Amino acid sequence: MSFFHKLSVWIRSNFFIPDARALWIKPSVKHLLKYLEENPVDAIFSDGPPHSNTRIATLIKQKTGIPWLADFQDPWTQVDYYQLLRLTSFGDRKHRRMEFEAFTAADKTTIVSPTWKGDLELLGAKNVSVIPWGYDPEDFKKLEPVSRPDQL
């Protein structure tokens, strides 16, 4: 890795927390709070990464109390590349604080792996379910082949 690549990773990791979309958070929360005043909803759903989505949902949940389902396609601080982010102790603490706030605010949390489910629960996530990636072959057994005359 070049010096400039290492520097860019360090800047991104320590100044744009939780991720490169961090600048979306404040304006998104402001817009969504105004939107929700005029358009009430029964629940909030967020999907991350990017964890800026999770942070936005955390703040909306904290300010409104609307039930929230937090979906994680990958863990936050437990993801395998987290140690490669070259975080300062301040950056690491901020990531972990945001992660903990999300886990304790969410009414329901989903993740794609049973192993990660245990990791999230150890970090404070409650009411965690696993929704694995993939498909169920049983869903496709009764399908008939389709001819595609437009293909070779």
Where are these regions (language model features)?
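Conserved nucleotide-sugar donor-binding subdomain of glycosyltransferases
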Residues: M1-A43, D92-R96
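Short His-centered aromatic/hydrophobic patch
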Residues: D47-H51
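A short helix->loop->beta-strand "cap" motif at the edges of active sites that frequently abuts
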Residues: T64-P67, A125-N127
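A short, histidine- and acid-enriched strand-loop-helix "catalytic/donor-clamping" loop
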Residues: P27-L33, S52-N53, I66, A70-T88, ...
